[in-house]
Structures are given as C-alpha cells and as structure tokens.
A protein has these predicted regions:
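Cytoplasmic helix-loop-helix junction between adjacent transmembrane helices
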Residues: 127-164
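Helix-loop-helix hairpin linking two adjacent transmembrane segments in secondary transporters
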Residues: 152, 160-205
Length: 426
C-alpha cells in the first residue's frame, strides 16, 4: 500500500514538474515577443530627429556639421546615462522593468519637447542629449530582463532583442517616407510609440526564472568587469564593432540621399532604401543568434565583422553609380554590421559575474557608445576632404580589431574547455 502511495506521489510530482516546465517554456517565448516589441517601440526615439534632418536643416538654416550634432548629442547623452547607471549599479539594485518603463516614458517626453518647443540648434542639442540619456535605461535593462528568461538559446534571444532595436532605429525613416510631411508630427508619433513600449514592459513583462535577488551597491564592480579576461576580450570585440556601427547608421542614409539625388531618383526612394538597409540588421541579428547557439559566438561574430569590414571598403565605390548596385552592397552591409552585436552581450552574461550582469552590460554599452562619438564626428570631416568614395574606409579598422579580439577569445575559451575536460578525466 505504501509503495502504491509512493508511486502515485512520484507520478504527481513528475506531472507537476512537467507542467512547471511547460509554463516556463511558454513564459519565455511570451517575454521574448513582448520585450522585442517594447524595445522596437522604445528605441524608435534614437533616430527620430536624424530621419527628418533635411527638413530641420531647411527650417533652422543648419550646416552639415550642425545637423550632425543632433545625432551626436543622442550618443553623448546615452554615454552619460549608461556611465551614471553603471557607477550606481542601477540595473542590478532596482527593478530593471521599472527602470525600462520610466526611462522610455521620460525619453518620449524629451523627444516630444523637441518636436513642440525646439526652434534652434542649442535647444535641439540639449533635448536630444536628454533623449539619449534616458534611452540608457531602455537598452541594457532590456538585455538583462531577457537574460533572466534564457540560458539555452540566449544568443538567439538577445539576437531577436537587438534585431527589434535595429528595426526601432530604422522606423523613423519609414515614417518619414510614408507619414506626414510635417517633421514635428512624425517625431511626436515616435514619442507615442515609446510610451507604449514602456507600458508593455511595466504591465505585461515579468522577470524570468534565472533572475537573481537585487544586488548591493558596490562601485568597485565597475573596475572588476575588466579583471575578467574573457569579458575584457568580449568588450574589445564590441568596441571594434561599435567604431563602425553607429557611424554607418548615421551617415549611410545621408550618402544614399546624395547618391540617389545625383542619379535623379525620387527622395522617397532614398528614405525607403535607408529603412530597408537599417532594417536588414534585424534579419542579420536573428540569423547570427541562431548560428551562434549552434557553432559558437566567437566565430559568428568574426564572420559578421569580416563581411561588414569588406563593405566599408567597397561601398564608397558605388556612390553615384547605379542605385540598384549601391542598394545591394548597402543591404549586405546593413545585415552584417549589427549581426554580431548581441553576441558580445551574450558573452558578457555568460562569462561575467551574474550578480552584477546589468552593471557589466551597461558599462560595455557606455564605453562602446563613447567610441561612436569619435567615428560619427570623423565621417563628415572625411567627406569634405575626400568625398563619399573614400570616407567609409576609415571605419574598416574597427571590425578588423574586433575580429582579432574574438579570435583571441575563441582561443582562450578552447583552452578553458580543454582544462575542464582534463580535470574531469583526473
């Protein structure tokens, strides 16, 4: 009788475990979809002004350099926000969900203030800086929340998240092509989307089963991130990637407009092409994430950077040539330039201290975006001197440095795996 009761108890426990596993599996896919949608909507603020720069330049009588500051201000604001967040360990000591929702809504308000009240470059740069600073609470916390739901398939999950971010940053170009001819209306629509994204995370997303209790504030964690050699190499790869990425995202649409205009194509075609090129990164991110979970993060990141680096060298020679040829090279560049992005973050979540994962991700992002301010500022200066034909070649050293860093990380991980096998044999 006791044996029968024991057997029934074991079967009941097994059924309960199976039910819990099914619930967790459904929960993680629900979280993936909701976070991806929220990230897409929240990060639509990033290029909301860049997409309408031609109209702003005309209205405010801005130079090319002045218009560039509207994008650069977002980068600088993001750097300031991520640095403050990392120093205070914000993503680890408070709810990442609440941080995401609060900063998405604050960023939306700063963006709306730009649309409603900005009338000159000084006010515009200040409000774009605030927008970037608040977006520092959207991207890294989103990655942390996603990591609490995924261990198996984390590369794919983070790839989906970065892909959604990429589509979000591309979306203002689509709105500009299809939406109102009034740039202020288009920017306000981006603010509305960001608020919806913040509310989605606050109301419908929960932390996953791999979440850890809130950590204690420890400013030393900022320095400890670089004591871990694996994390350090992953960060170096990320820095090479970032040297290229945002300068390409910022200035390739400008180059497409100029090249299409030189061939007599309609302006709306350049806007659609810009959306397609930047949006192609979403496909690249998801594809790279799926591959990375199968063959490894370091080789996939290396392949992506090798391809995007080749596009840096080639794209300028397509300027003012056939729009179709330029678009083909640009779409390949758009798909590969961001494909590796999530894998650097995945490496940090897997190789670093899980208790301070949010701090490590935020610091990685902060330093990477600080580097982008240099390359973004460099490209227009080169265009004035050597033209579009050669300007983007200056971005190629970034992916080259990234490939070298990833190959060194691959070598270290292989050595660590071999040592682990030897210990198990002994």
């Amino acid at each position: 009788m006791k044996g029968m009761l024991k057997g029934k108890t074991q079967r009941a426990a097994w059924v309960e475990d199976e039910a819990d596993a099914a619930t967790r599996e459904a929960g993680r896919w629900r979280a993936l979809v909701l976070l991806a949608v929220a990230e897409l909507l929240g990060m639509a603020l990033w290029f909301s002004a860049s997409a309408v720069v031609p109209a702003i330049r005309s209205e405010w009588k801005l130079s090319e350099a002045g218009a560039g500051w509207l994008t650069l201000a977002v980068q600088l604001g993001f750097v300031a926000g991520t640095l403050l967040s990392a120093l205070l360990n914000l993503p680890d000591i408070i709810s990442a969900r609440r941080l995401f929702a609060l900063t998405a809504c604050c960023g939306a308000l700063a963006n709306a203030a730009f649309a409603l009240f900005a009338t000159d470059l000084t006010a515009g740069v200040a409000l774009r800086f605030l927008t970037g600073m608040f977006l520092a609470g959207v991207y890294p916390p989103g990655m942390k929340i996603m990591a609490t739901w995924f261990r198996r398939g984390r590369g794919m999950a983070l790839g989906v998240l970065v892909g959604a971010l990429t589509l979000g940053k591309a979306s203002p170009y689509l709105v500009n092509a299809l939406g109102s001819s009034e740039w202020r209306v288009n920017m306000l629509s981006m603010s509305a989307l960001a608020i919806v994204g913040g509310l989605i995370v606050l109301l419908f997303v929960t932390d996953g089963p791999y979440a850890l209790p809130a950590a204690r504030f420890d400013v030393r964690q900022v320095l400890r991130v670089f004591e871990n050699r694996g994390v350090r190499l992953a960060n170096f790869g990320y820095f090479g990637h970032m040297w290229e990425l945002y300068a390409m995202w910022t200035w390739l649409p400008v180059m497409l407009r100029a090249s299409f205009a030189a061939r007599g194509a309609e302006a709306s075609l350049a806007e659609m092409a810009s959306f397609a090129v930047l949006g192609a990164g979403a496909f690249g991110c998801v594809t790279a994430g799926l591959l990375a979970d199968r063959v490894g993060r370091t080789p996939v990141a290396s392949w992506a950077m090798a391809l995007s680096g080749a596009c840096c060298l080639l794209i300028g020679f397509c300027y003012a040539s056939s729009p179709a040829l330029l678009f083909v090279v640009a779409i390949i560049w758009g798909a590969t330039v961001v494909a590796d992005s999530a894998q650097f973050s995945a490496c940090v979540t897997e190789l670093g201290d899980p208790q301070y994962m949010g701090t490590a991700l935020t610091l990685q992002t902060c330093l990477g975006f600080l580097l982008t301010t240099v390359s973004i500022h460099l490209i227009p200066a080169l265009v004035e001197r050597v033209g579009w034909r050669y300007a983007f070649i200056a971005l190629a050293p970034g992916p080259l440095f990234g490939v070298v860093s990833m190959l060194r990380l691959q070598k270290q991980l292989g050595r660590r795996k071999a040592e682990s096998v030897m210990i198990q044999v002994e």
